[in-house]
Design a protein with these regions (language model features):
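C-terminal beta-signal and adjacent terminal beta-strands/loops
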Residues: 26-73, 85-93, 97-160
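Extracellular loop and loop/strand-boundary signature of outer-membrane beta-barrel proteins
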Residues: 1-6, 15, 79-83, 139-143
Length: 160
């Protein structure tokens, strides 16, 4: 109950651009740009306004949280995405390829660099706003997932 709102992977905008250019018979360069809007951040609570049980919920205790009588506690619904959105992410990759034929075989050597500008933006956060009824989580909205760091891949293939 109360779990309406935006789902965790709701990215409103996503753009992907890819291109390559062969500047000679043996050489080509290429690039990829992926731009994504941030996903929603939830603000999950622990309490339950309907009875005294404690569990992961969509309700946050806002008053009388320390009362031993559950019916005296006052809760507010926390819709999915109530914690705002994460920042946009940008990922640019580049590659260079070399082609060579020998006999009846074709060889390709490709060096690709991913996340060329080494963006390290947060892609996931701690969505638990409360650790217990009325107790705020000190790590709420702290990063738990980040963009992959820059890395390179060398590929050699031979077709015969």
């Amino acid at each position: 109950y109360g779990g309406t709102g935006y789902l965790p992977n709701d990215r409103r905008h996503q753009f992907k651009f890819r291109g390559a250019y062969g500047f000679s018979e043996n050489w080509a360069v290429g690039g990829t740009l992926v731009v994504q809007s941030g996903r929603p951040v939830n603000a999950f609570g622990v309490g339950n306004p309907f009875d005294g049980t404690n569990y992961h919920s969509n309700f946050i205790c806002v008053a009388n949280c320390t009362s031993d009588t559950p019916s005296e506690r006052i809760y507010e619904a926390s819709l999915r995405g109530a914690g705002g959105r994460l920042p946009w992410t940008y990922d640019f990759g580049a590659n260079v390829s070399f082609f060579h034929s020998f006999g009846s075989a074709d060889m390709r050597v490709k060096l690709a660099v991913y996340n060329l500008f080494n963006q390290e933006r947060v892609t996931e956060v701690d969505d638990e706003r409360e650790t217990d009824i009325g107790f705020l989580n000190p790590s709420y909205r702290q990063g738990t997932g980040y963009q992959s760091p820059r890395y390179a891949q060398l590929t050699i293939s031979v077709n015969f």
